[in-house]
Amino acid sequence: MESTELWLWLDEANGYSQVESNPYLHELKDKIKIVSWNVEKEIVGTPFLKIKEYIHAAKNLAAKGDDFRIISLYKYGGLYFDLDVMFLKDFTPLLKGHEFVYAWEYQPYANSAILYLRKNSYITNYLAKKLQKRKAAMPWVLFDYKDKKLANLRNYPCTFFDPLWGGYCEGMPLSKFTDFFKEFGDGFDKKKTINSYKEFFPGAFAYHWHNSWDAKEVENSYFGLFNREFNQILNNNKQYTNF
């Protein structure tokens, strides 16, 4: 992507304080911007200060993540994406167009796992007001298709960013999300046509593997194949956003 700066937000108390001791973050710190997230500080001077009791209320991590993406994009603008997403194509053409979310199969609301909002835009300001009013940031609350004020928020097909979510189709390299981390062999073979992330779901902009945080890193897997490729790109000092 052109002139892109990648920010990794880490909770100030649980994550950011371990930046120097975390080997995975240490190897990335010169290539991306690692930023501390303290919601109490971030809502100062914003409309969210009016609902600080809701913001600070006990929530599960998913709900906190829903709050985070709206607050951060309101303040800074940009493209939010979940960390279980792998980019397959340059997003530049999408970022030059409308602000967007993507469809969540047949649900009557959009998925905000990938969400592009511009700072101080009509849609961004409206979503901030809606969050204040509803005191909830879940996608079925904020991104309900019945909300006509979101008519100009582009809703891309699910297959653009989540090609396996709608189910397996003949020719796909995977039939289950966990297959992304599965070792090749015993009837599960790598497709001969896939030797790069560029050939993995070539019609999609991204692949969303949906959690699997406890999956083992297997070298002889699709994850291992692409992990080596991305490491090589980084080690060769190429632009990490150059797709």
Segments predicted by a language model, with ranges:
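Small-residue hinge/turn detector
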Residues: 67-76
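Glycosyltransferase-associated regions of secretory-pathway enzymes
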Residues: 1-65, 83-243
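Active-site acidic Asp-centered loop
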Residues: 76, 81-82
